[in-house]
Every structure is written in structure tokens, then in C-alpha cells.
Amino acid sequence: TGIIKGKVVEKGTYKVMLKAENALGTDTQELLINIGDELLLTPPMGWNSWNTFGRHLTEELLLQTADAMVENGMRDLGYAYINIDDFWQLPERGADGHIQIDKTKFPRGIKYVADYLHERGFKLGIYSDAADKTCGGVCGSYGYEEIDARDFASWGVDLLKYDYCNAPAGRVEAMERYEKMGRALRATDRSIVFSICEWGQREPWKWAKKVGGHLWRVSGDIGDLWNRSTDEKGGLRGILNILEINAPLSEYARPGGWNDPDMLVVGIGGKSKSIGYESEGCTNEQYQSHFALWCMMASPLLCGNDVRQMNDSTLQILLNKDLIAINQDPLGIQAERAIRADHYDVWVKPLSDGSKAIACLNRISGPVDVELNVKTVEGLSLDRVYDVIEGSLVAEASTGWIVKLAPGECKVFICK
């Protein structure tokens, strides 16, 4: 099946030789399995129900999504998490103290969904809130952290997204509430990734790791938008808005703890039931830039579109193996902006093999030319330059070259 299952008793790094054979020949690859206390050594990849479906999530939707991600190749490229967002539970907690699953949406329960996903090589994420009620007004986990954490573990949950609606505004109170749930998750017999979602209002990059977090939102909710001011239509932020928020936070990203600039909006195309607000969405070029920038920033890659029905352009963006490899590079370094010009940016991300990923972004509505050479980017080697989007080598780049960018376009190169 290609799915490796099992348990390891002792910590350590284990080497496994994998062999593949078909009519074209045979190949081997060494797989390193790191076993230790730290989770999420690379940014999580997967899918979340919120951006397209909002409150309209069901068991059937989750299972169909998993099947689609197997068929279209997403699972095999690392999109492992399938995350249930708000509205899986009833408004009121049960008399026995447990959260009640909405059986009209999940008639066979959450464990059934988890088992279905695990059998196919996926992991299950779930959602709750550090208050009595979630953002949608259904049952939250405040005061019942241990009970809920045990339930999540017994169902087979692998990730908890923990929101902060209807909770105290202060940083100290937020840290206390997140620390309590983080401690409850660690007390279970299951490794559960803890996703902290308080929208960056209390600088979680400075404390989230201390309370057990593995990723933390740095901004308000993303919209299916390229750029907009926050006072429009619910305060949703555009892709460029969030890019600016996350840009100065690179020092806080590392294996086991990631800045989270929110989920991907690639391919939504204005069809969201939760974040679209009748938006027409972005162009394919803007979606391509969005994905490239999130890969450069070592961001979580959690898709929010309907993966059951994607056009070729969306699929091509999300299945770019080279961009995914940049995102999943084991060094875990978030790209830093090397050049901020009037109309364009140049971003640099060191990679584990000694090469560098270079991203050139056009921020304006007209074309831009960017000159790249050893003088414009310090320490840049141009012996071999690979165009990640086009999937080809750049000819005659040893002394530098001109990168031509269409409006909103981002091109990425690997330079050795």
C-alpha cells in the first residue's frame, strides 16, 4: 500500500531502505524516521473544511475528500491531514460532561472517520475553542480540557485546532487557557499536534511553543483575495496583507514550531461559503504566487478548496513537487526578504543541501523586470539555476539574468 504503520519503543533516528520496481527499472531510497518527543518536524500539509464549506461539513464530505486526495495524488505528495473545523459538535455539552457529536452530520461518529482516514494513510484533525462556545456558537472546551483531550485521543484524532473566540482578551489569560489544553493533550497516550489559533493578536510566536503549540496563527482570517484593507467585509485579509505580517517573524519558525499565515485559498475561485463574501477570488497567477510564497515561508500547507473537483490549473499548482520540497526542507528555515523594492520583492530560503531557493514577487498590477546576480543577492551561487515553476534549468545564468514578472506573478528558482 505504501503506508508504513507501527510503533517504535525507543527514541532515535532509524534508517529504512525503500525499493521500488516496475517495467521502467528499479530504484532505492533511504528513508530516515526520527522518533522523539518533538512533533511536526516539517510544516503540516493537508486540507481543512472551513474555507469552502464553513458550517456545511459532513461525514460524507470528509470521506469523499480523502478518496479524492488519494486519487489525484495529493496524499502521496504529503497532504496528510484532513481537518474538521467548526460545527461538528452540538451547541450544548452532554449531561455526562462530554462534547456531543452532531449525528446528523457524523452519523457514525468521529472515530469512524478517523479509522477511515488512517486506513488510507491520512491523519485526522479536529476543532475546538478555549471558551464555553466556539466561534460558531457550538460547544467549546473551556473547563473540560482533560475530558475533551481524552475523547479526542480515544477517537484517533491527530491534530487539534484550538480557536479563541468568546475568551478573555489578555495575553496572560490566553496563555493559561492554551497551556491547560496543551497539558491535557500531552497527558493522553496519543501524539496530537496542537494548532493555536488566536489570530496573532497576542504575539503567540513568542509563547505558543512554551504552552505546547506546534503551529500558531499570525494574523486574522485569510480571504479568497489578493490584497485588501482590513476594514472591508468582515476584516478578512488578502494574501499580500498576510505576507507582510509574517515577513518579520522568520526567527520563530523551526522544526517543531511554525508560523501559520492561515490556510491556502488556492482554487476556491470565489465559491466559499465562509470566507468568500461574494468575492470573485484570485487569478490563477495569484494562486500560483500564493502557493509559492507559503512554500518559501515554511508555512503549513492546508488546502481549503473543494479537492473533489479541481481544474487542471489548481491541480498543477498544488502538486508542484519542487515547491513542496522547498516547503518540507528539513532545515525548516522560513524565507527572509533580501530585497524590498518599490514594485517587487526578492526572498531567500536556505536549503539543507547547501542550495538556496530564491523567489521574485511582483506586487503591482503591471509587469516588472528583476535583475538577479551575485551582487543583488549576497552569497548567491549561479552555477546551476533551476526554475521551479517551469521545471527546467535557466540557460546562461552564471553571470546573472533578468526575471520577467507578469502582474502578481512570483517565480521561484533553486540556485546552486
Predicted regions and their residues:
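Aromatic-lined carbohydrate-binding/catalytic grooves of carbohydrate-active enzymes
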Residues: 51, 65, 69-171
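Carbohydrate-binding surface patches
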Residues: 288, 294-297, 302-304, 340-378, ...
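C-terminal beta-strand-rich structural cap/linker in extracellular carbohydrate-active enzymes
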Residues: 396-416
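Strand-loop-strand motifs at the edges of beta-sheets in extracellular beta-sandwich domains
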Residues: 1-9
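C-terminal edge beta-strand
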Residues: 25-36
